Amino acid sequence: MKKLMILGGSRYAVPVIEAAHNLGLYVITCDYLPDNIAHKFSDEYCNVSIIDKEATYEAAKRLKIDGIVSFACDPGVATAAYIAEKMGLPFQCSYRATEILQDKGLFRHFLTENGFNCPHAKRYEDKKSPFNDIDYFNWPVIVKPTDSAGSKGVTRVDRVEDLADAINVALGGAHNGAFIIEDFLTFEGYHSSTDPFTVDGQLKFATYSDQLFDPEADNPYTPAYIIWPSTMKQEHQDYLTSEIQRLMTLLNMKTGIYNIETCVANGKPYIMEVSPRGGGCKIAELQRMAYGVDLIEAEVKKAVGMPIDEIKQTECDGCWCEMVVHARPGKSGILRSVTIDSDIKEKYLKVVDLSAKPGDFVQPFTGANMSLGDMFFRFDDRTELETVMSKSNEWLHIELDEK
């Protein structure tokens, strides 16, 4: 029986475990949090810090694994690439390419050096150095950890006097002690976050989405809704698909899933993030329902060297919306219940996956890690989607008790 090691134990790993079990694989989940939910579904738990490459590598050798993934688990991606390279296991790319993709500063430098559209950006480790580069940026700017996902540690800065605080916030969310400052891009339309797939370095499946933010949330840069298909102009989608393929070729990518974020600003399409892993927010699961393409199964098969079914580009069946369920702005307390009006539930709701349960303490929506779970909705067209989702405050009820 082949062994698949999954780095991370969040609920986003559960569909990967299910796919692996359906293929007859033995699943080992790894992190340093034994109570994480995914460990209840795996065949074996390995207690190791997944950002410690050498410790995780030693565990992988001892356990004689046949494949490794860090699905929807950003901190483990570089470790997964490192172990795959050391053990000769399949992975999307080399460890060096992964280092570039996983560090926002290195990635921005790579994009700029190779002629991709890219905002002014600089990577720093010293808190004081940015104050020598104030005129380099087109203000406002955005400050981020270089190695953190889920919008953690991200702050928009409009005034120089607020920069120091934003740097401290970014460093608080960083694992490697580095942060990036870049021009704040005002999107034309919406930001896109999707999970494409390559086979032998060729982009075989790619979608674009409309990622909507809750402007009233405690962190207004954390996605609250993701909608397929995108309203992005087709010419911009075609340009981005071509540029993503160029990026894949330059980095000598192989086979696997990616989480890719793109946008259009100043009349130009931008590749913002590329990570060799499945995305959080259950993106691949929604794409499976909307497009009929199972990239989770394909990624698992790839990881352990099994033949992959042909991956084909398909069209979206209707209009789909993923809602990231979160507390109302400024609200916190003990969760009593999450309910949906019956008419909405019966007509549009397809999936409910709540991570929070009654009795849990709910905090304001400051990052993806503060979500209460996800819901998938299907509509016949975009007008119907927007009409219903714009009234979610009326039909979605999140009841909290004071702490």
Task: Briefly describe each language-model feature range.
Residues 1-96, 128, 306-309, 315-318, ...:
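ATP-binding N-terminal substructure of ATP-dependent carboxylate-amine bond-forming enzymes
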Residues 100-180, 200-202, 226-242, 246, ...:
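Active-site nucleotide/adenylate-binding loops and adjacent lid/helix of ATP-dependent enzymes
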Residues 155, 183, 228-229, 288, ...:
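Short, well-ordered beta-strand elements within core beta-sheets of diverse protein domains
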Residues 158-159, 325-329, 375-381:
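Short beta-strand-to-loop capping motifs
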Residues 161, 183-191, 195-253, 257, ...:
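ATP-dependent carboxylate/phosphate-activation module, predominantly the ATP-grasp catalytic core
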Residues 258, 342-360:
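A structural supersecondary motif
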Residues 307-347:
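A glycine-rich beta-turn/hairpin centered on an aromatic-Pro dipeptide
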